[in-house]
Amino acid sequence: GFAFGAFYYTLLGRQWMAALGKTEAELSRGNKATPFIVAAVAQIVLAFVLAGAIGHLGPGQVTARNGVISGAILWAGIVMTTMAVNHRFQGSKWSLTLIDGAHWLGVLVLQGFVIGLIGV
């Protein structure tokens, strides 16, 4: 998931900064390591939670296909709904919600695929 995020935001970095309303100089201030540490820990927690959800499908149901489907369902029902509410109250642009939301869809689908391949 972390490598996907690096690739994704490298491609969409300019659009993401515009949607965020910040410049590269503004983003480079402060502790640069903290967001990456938080992201890494959060993605580990996310993977464990996703593995638990996939594992609850029952014996013989932990497959790459079911992992992808579970990741997409959890993204639609939890991640995007929460992000949409938070972004609206924060006054964020819809483009930021779409860019960040698509990132998390990619993360959950990839994690679900890998979890489905290796099992829980």
Regions from the PLM with identified roles:
Residues 1-120:
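Juxtamembrane/disordered regions of integral membrane proteins
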